């Protein structure tokens, strides 16, 4: 209870009640003195959305120094584009999506994507085996590759982040 210049080494029920009151009524300055650091494993396209929150500090594992085999993210379903320009996708699934890769044959999008990822993963490995520096070889890796990072921030920033990113309007993959 800083406002009253009171200090305690234990958390009492009245302190818990005060914490809930302060959070509920958006009196958040007291939450800026405590922090948390999490290690996240997310696809690159999600990491870039997360890193737009400038109240956090980030450290990301670098493919410049780490050349372990990459892992890739796939959505549970391919969603349709939203009619509302404010949203990237709707909940409606695209069924039997077809692409025309390099020929007149039409292929299911998942098959094309799977083949592409196999090719890119193999090419990346071959480039490293040929002695190409990881900092150059990494440029061919796609946005759905997983990356790992540490994310640190105070509790007020975490509360704000979760409020925005768990909202139903946020991209599904961010919510997950």
Regions found by a protein language model. Give the residues of each.
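Family-specific signature for flavin-dependent thymidylate synthase
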Residues: 1-176
């Amino acid at each position: 209870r800083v406002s009253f210049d009171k200090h305690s080494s234990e958390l009492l029920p009245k302190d818990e009640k005060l914490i809930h009151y302060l959070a509920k009524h958006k009196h958040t300055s007291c939450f800026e003195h405590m922090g948390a650091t999490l290690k996240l494993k997310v696809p690159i396209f999600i990491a870039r959305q997360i890193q737009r929150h400038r109240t956090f500090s980030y450290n990301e594992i670098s493919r410049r120094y780490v050349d372990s085999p990459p892992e890739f993210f796939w959505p549970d379903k391919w969603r349709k584009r939203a009619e509302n320009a404010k949203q990237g996708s709707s909940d409606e699934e695209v069924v039997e999506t077809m692409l025309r890769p390099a020929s007149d044959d039409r292929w299911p999008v998942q098959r094309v994507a799977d083949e592409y990822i196999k090719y890119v993963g193999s090419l990346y490995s071959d480039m490293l085996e040929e002695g190409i520096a990881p900092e150059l070889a990494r440029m061919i890796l796609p946005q759905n590759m997983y990356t790992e990072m540490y994310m640190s921030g105070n509790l007020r920033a975490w509360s704000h982040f979760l409020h925005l990113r768990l909202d139903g309007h946020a991209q599904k993959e961010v919510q997950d």
